[in-house]
């Protein structure tokens, strides 16, 4: 480390790069919002279908994006008497 570097300002490139990455991630998330919800819905249905039978029309997946936090809301109407699937050994 030279004496000149000791008194110089730290490079702002890493901070700018990090800010740009956050901005790009936010932009991508806002454009792919509907695709992400559809993919999540199908994956959640696949996992639940391994264990019980449900009506696919009775599942609701909603994503709300806020400034500081995003919320994923999943509503699943389960039948009163469920038929558990037995795993083959």
UniProtKB/Swiss-Prot annotation:
GO terms of biological process kind: cell division; regulation of division septum assembly
Pfam families, sorted: MinE
Alphabetical UniProt keywords: Cell cycle, Cell division
InterPro entries xrefs: MinE, MinE_sf
General function of this protein: Prevents the cell division inhibition by proteins MinC and MinD at internal division sites while permitting inhibition at polar sites. This ensures cell division at the proper site by restricting the formation of a division septum at the midpoint of the long axis of the cell.
NCBIfam families linked: minE, PRK00296.1
Recorded family membership: Belongs to the MinE family.
Protein name per the record: Cell division topological specificity factor
Gene behind the chain: minE
